[in-house]
Amino acid sequence: MANPLYQKHIISINDLSREDLELVLATAAKLKANPQPELLKHKVIASCFFEASTRTRLSFETSMHRLGASVVGFSDSANTSLGKKGETLADTISVISTYVDAIVMRHPQEGAARLATEFSGGVPVLNAGDGANQHPTQTLLDLFTIQETQGRLENLNVAMVGDLKYGRTVHSLTQALAKFNGNRFYFIAPDALAMPQYILDMLDEKGIAWSLHSAIDDVMAEVDILYMTRVQKERLDPSEYANVKAQFVLRAADLEGARANMKVLHPLPRIDEITTDVDKTPHAWYFQQAGNGIFARQALLALVLNSELAL
């Protein structure tokens, strides 16, 4: 089938319409059920990680290999010309784009992925995270997991907990779920790490219900999805981190009274915001969520690199 994502840059979740999201999720489900090990057999994809990553990088590279693509790139920019010789990001991308069919990129600077599109010569750039800004492929696997566990992406009660200021995953996920009808949001965070005002303004403009809370217990009985996040030490000064890191911790005992099919999600890595006794409960779904990253990213790569896709 012809698809609207062919050769498209994927920088922000807002680059994707509701119909685009549904296409990616449907493709992910097909690839999960029916692997396609030669779909990208003659493609070369650059995996360029200017910032540390475990799950996102390995998930993306596994996705590439399982579709038959060749993979080039780096996991540490310190050993590149950009890191050692002071080459600009623009020049780095201009050169890499002459070698490959697509560029997957993570960078600590907000807006770096969007900047890269200006120098990629039309080669698609897929944002694997740019600072505290956007993480669209994490959002796709989150949506895929929510749809699998809840059977829908509409009329959901979704709580987001922890670092909502710097946590790019919650920004992207809120924007994505706002494209679907009837969803309600509960934001649970210390004042220093509250959801940015532009997200709240967006929800208000769309007439979407949201509320602020100071404790997980306030909403446990009402939610379908409890999306936990870690306090990101690397984005805070030491005194601020010490003050807020243990303020919101989920324990197995806290899950009493939760809806039977409520799922706890987390973009990982987990530090101490979810105790290990939660892992043994039927609500814990963060490891399955991480595994779904393979299928969501396979779907996106397949769509971006194939003008027509019949699965």
Swiss-Prot record:
Carbamoyl phosphate binds at residues 55-56, 106, 135, 138, 268-269. One of its GO terms (biological process) is 'de novo' pyrimidine nucleobase biosynthetic process. This is Aspartate carbamoyltransferase catalytic subunit. Its EC number is 2.1.3.2. GO terms for cellular component: cytosol. NCBIfam families: asp_carb_tr (TIGR00670), PRK00856.1 (NF002032). The keyword Phosphoprotein does not apply. It comes from the Bacteria. Belongs to the aspartate/ornithine carbamoyltransferase superfamily. ATCase family. It comes from Klebsiella pneumoniae subsp. pneumoniae (strain ATCC 700721 / MGH 78578). InterPro entries: Asp/Orn_carbamoyltranf_P-bd, Asp/Orn_carbamoylTrfase, Asp/Orn_carbamoylTrfase_sf, Asp_carbamoyltransf, Asp_carbamoyltransf_Asp/Orn-bd. One of its GO terms (molecular function) is amino acid binding. Pathway: Pyrimidine metabolism; UMP biosynthesis via de novo pathway; (S)-dihydroorotate from bicarbonate: step 2/3. It holds the Pfam family OTCace_N. Heterododecamer (2C3:3R2) of six catalytic PyrB chains organized as two trimers (C3), and six regulatory PyrI chains organized as three dimers (R2). Keywords: Pyrimidine biosynthesis, Transferase. Catalyzes the condensation of carbamoyl phosphate and aspartate to form carbamoyl aspartate and inorganic phosphate, the committed step in the de novo pyrimidine nucleotide biosynthesis pathway. L-aspartate binds at residues 85, 168, 230. It catalyses: carbamoyl phosphate + L-aspartate = N-carbamoyl-L-aspartate + phosphate + H(+).
